[in-house]
Amino acid sequence: TEKVTEYDKNGNIKKLQRYGQTGASSYGLVDNLTYTYNGNKITRVDDAVTATSYTGGTNFINGASTNNEYTYDANGNLTKDLNKGISNIQYNLLNLPSVVTFSDGSTITYTYTHDGKKLRTVHVIGGVTTTTDYCGNVIYENGTPKRLLTDEGYVDLSTATPTYYYYLKDHQGNNRAVVNASASV
């Protein structure tokens, strides 16, 4: 769970606490975050909790401790996120990310149609290239069909027997969870 404990005068979250699993059978504070802004643009996040959460946890990892952990271009697009190891983000004419470069040299390159629909994503990690193509409602990975998208969810085509997954939506139509046919999340 999350609890906002303070906002700034612009309505931005200034302090946030997250609670989650801290051990095999224990729960507690996993994040005690303080946000710093320049106007409405976040520039820094600090976490007063130094212990990492339980395996598989979702706590914030403070990957940098500088005054400008996040930087932006003239259009307000994020160009650097040191906490996630992102050293540079380039944008196309539609202000959509075209190339994301990480501090370890990995890259993600995006290709879009003229109206901004994503056609391809290319990940280069440790010299290994993975190409994902988005063709209508089918997602291909390195030329092999991996997912068939539907309004209700998707079909995982990466195994010998296709597996169906369904979206659970809230009252506003937002996806809140994805479950399989056995209702496992």
Where are these regions (language model features)?
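Residue-level markers of secondary-structure register and packing in elongated scaffolds
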Residues: 1-15, 69-131, 155-185
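Conserved catalytic cores of ATP-dependent inositol ring kinases
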Residues: 1-59, 115-117, 122-124, 130-138
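Surface-exposed acidic, glycine/proline-enriched linker/cap segments
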Residues: 49-66, 150-159
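Extended, non-globular alpha-helical segments
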Residues: 134, 143, 148-149
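Short polybasic amphipathic segments
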Residues: 137-141, 153-156
